[in-house]
Amino acid sequence: ERYAEFERMVGESIPTGFHINDREIIDRQEFCAFINEQYQQVCKDFPGMINPETIIDDKFISAFIKRIGITVESFYRALPSLGGGNHFLEYGETEDGRGFFTAHCGSRNLGVRVCNYWVRKAKSSCSAIAEEDFQNVVEKVKAGCPDRTQWQRMILEAKQRLREEEYLSDYLGGANLRGYLSDMVITQAYARFNHIMIHRLVGGILQEHFGIGIENEIFTTHNYIDFRDNPMIRKGAIRA
């Protein structure tokens, strides 16, 4: 009976699946301060990896949201929420009465939006490079082969070789790479803030209605960019 009541209260407080909150319930000032703190820490610890910003404030976040194609309402009203897929909330107790609450959730589609934005950037950038290289090949063929009947065959062969070149794979470099890493720092901080809000709500329910206090909290992530490894994208894994 206690578990059923706890589950009902949590379900009423934290949206799941595609659902988000009917209204914005977070403190934007607290949110922006948290994102800024996380961002500036990465700037300090790993100089040159991401774009230096004086401050991450509400104006900065609004521009970020608009750029990647998310509405302000959905961005803020998704905090806190669980999402779908393999995300879950779980509470269990040991035989001696100790309780453990687990929240497994993420950035609520923000990571996918950021990824898609920069994939489009990569494709656009690499397409421009490929076109420039191809035009150079065409000019070299025409200049080096007097037999015009061979031009089409030679150009097609050269085009195929270009397609097989490794550098024609979609990738980010320079300013675009820093832009992607910068956005991912914000996305990871967003996901962490979502966890904080969920734990805050659940902790309040446990304390107020069941007289249970939270003694320790552990936070870990398994989909993230590890800047300590130059950097490394860890998908479904943590650092050993």
Predicted regions and their residues:
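Glycine-rich, flexible loop motifs
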Residues: 1-96, 112-240
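Hydrophobic residues embedded in beta-strands of well-ordered beta-sheets
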Residues: 98-100
